[in-house]
Amino acid sequence: SPVFYTDGVVDSGFAKLVGQDKSHIKARFVQGASSPIDAIGFGLGKKMNLLKKGTPLRIAYTLEENVWQGNVSVQLRLKDIE
């Protein structure tokens, strides 16, 4: 599947470490006045400090369908964060 790149996204303040060993990131990104979109980054826990700064980020990701408790949504599967 294609990998997308977006510059200038900011975490909405939702970012947290998840997983048994807290090595994954769950975040909600916004860009400008756009609606927030959920994201998950497996193995990217070490990059959490970048999200807490509130500065614009560059992200690489794929799109995926997320099904949780009967609800279906689109989320970003993060490949990298800078």
Task: Please place each PLM-identified region on the residue numbering.
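Acidic, two-metal ion nucleic-acid-processing modules in DNA metabolism proteins
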Residues: 1-82
